[in-house]
Amino acid sequence: MAIKPILFNTPMVRAVRSDIKTETRRLINPRYRDDEYSFQIITNAHTGEFVRVEMIDEWENCTRFLPPQYLPGDILWVRESWAVAADLPGISDGGFVYRSDYTDYELSQLKEKHFCWKPSIHLPKSAARTFIKVTGVWAERLQDITDEQCIREGIQKWSKDGKLYKYAPADGEGDYPMWPWQDTPIAPRGAFVKLWDSTVPKSKLPQCGFAANPWVWAYRFEQCGNPFTEKEVEE
């Protein structure tokens, strides 16, 4: 078992902490070619099994193994956008505060006061409060995702009248979809496509967007307790 960090944006931190999001997909190293002959899945996926993707390099005529960053049993501490509590207007207490705990309205109020949150990548280990345990790992093309798996990615079902249903992550208040109703997809897959592409820089959409159908590692996980001892946190 390894203990490693993992990044999530603010909406997904909320979904993880609410046990709504239990899967995440991460690009397999995009610097390698990924045509039909260069990537091959060579092991079946199930909890506890090492899963890898084989790449055949036609120029060097050799095989390279690209292991996933996380394996079943690993515990991941979530890096999220944060701040020192004393930096917030009107707060003098010590400790840390987290952007995902604030509603969209509260965040807009803080923005008007020119308050800046610290990037999640800079969250110190001692400030971590959310921990997840990897229970499954497998490799697949991004477009292989099912509707059920889209729901596991943090997509929720919404309706205004109990007749028409649409799908999206929750907004900052947790009571409405993230997107305007007219822009909210009517299927889980459409919502996942919209969510995925929103995280990809426009310049990389041709290679990494949903339409490009890149290879990804899919990780299934569940929340768990803090694995750190006091000594490990200090390190």
Feature-to-residue mapping (PLM):
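Secondary-structure transition motif
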Residues: M1-E235
